[in-house]
């Protein structure tokens, strides 16, 4: 009986898909941006690994925007800067929706994960809550905490440079746990709760990979008994964890002992914000998911670039010596006088973008671009990797050149941008906290050390994880101190 039900459901779904695909092929082929040919029914085969690199190759063949088909799904991939501005920025009102994500959002997240929440009132509610705590004026209040943890990061690299990537993860986790839950002590990346959170993030990233679950192409499979039961188990495990963390803050608030945090803000304003307990837990968890993973990866990329491009590193250090000297450590107050540091960070964002493949948008209305039509309902991917390699905007894009971000007066250019934090109304709300982290860590670590590669084990700058947010695979560095009495100046704050 069960087999008959499953067979009937699949047959109905395939018949519906066949009719829909044939209809789409007749009505849309002439107007869509070009793309590689695919199977008449199933469309294009999803890339098996590193989709952003595969899509970048297709950009070279088919142009700034190309079209793929996965069953009934139409996916338009953007690989050039101006096309991204035209479609995802200027048409933000029509392209800020998210495609339906059955596996990762509906099954794994109960529809509460802000990253995948469709455009509408719920998304506005979530973003209002996030913006209230992460806007520039609020983000500035985190600088003392970020500075303390950045000094710990430098001291960790001084004492144990071999595990520099781990120290970057520890920095990121400590900052994010402080912002999200008010934790005031450094957070080890081996803490049980952090390990559980990262396990959940890895599961989410796997579910978001193109073609990972057939249910995203044929949503009717969601209703097949037993289908994707492991995803439902993942959901319950994650919800139990983030609810436990939120409840711990509730208990501290009840005692009058809770330090300021995003979770405390949500609890105190829960009724006004109109959010349920589950929504509150997911919003708090989103801070860790969005901030820890990406910041840790960006710190690894920053040190990789410093080691691989010693001349660029030396330019930053020359300005640090001129502005700061070696008798004190740089601080946030020096930022306006250190454009070389900012340029180095901006180039690291571009050179190896953390969200390399970007996250899918969905058109709610037809979007006309250069004579082509991206139809309502189509998915739109801004491929950060390909956009970052647009030779018209970033000449010699494979080279690491922080100087491209500076004008003739040595100040940061206003006419050059890289959209590394997302597009339009989907831009990352936490970008100001992230920028603060990258600036102060870059300033401190390049002030403190001359970073170089291990001659016996040169760095492969293309060796990254195949995940939604990419991380450098382990690589060796030498941290040669540039400053005497570093510990005395920074203070022995490592715990």
UniProtKB/Swiss-Prot annotation:
Chief location category: membrane
Enzyme class, broadest EC rank: oxidoreductase
Membrane-spanning ranges: 2-22
Coiled coil: none
EC number: 1.-.-.-
GO terms under cellular component: membrane
Pathway: Secondary metabolite biosynthesis
Pfam families xrefs: p450
Highest taxon above the source species: Eukaryota
Function: Cytochrome P450 monooxygenase that is able to use 4-ethoxybenzoic acid as a substrate for oxidation.
Protein name: Cytochrome P450 monooxygenase 64
Source taxonomy: Eukaryota, Fungi, Dikarya, Basidiomycota, Agaricomycotina
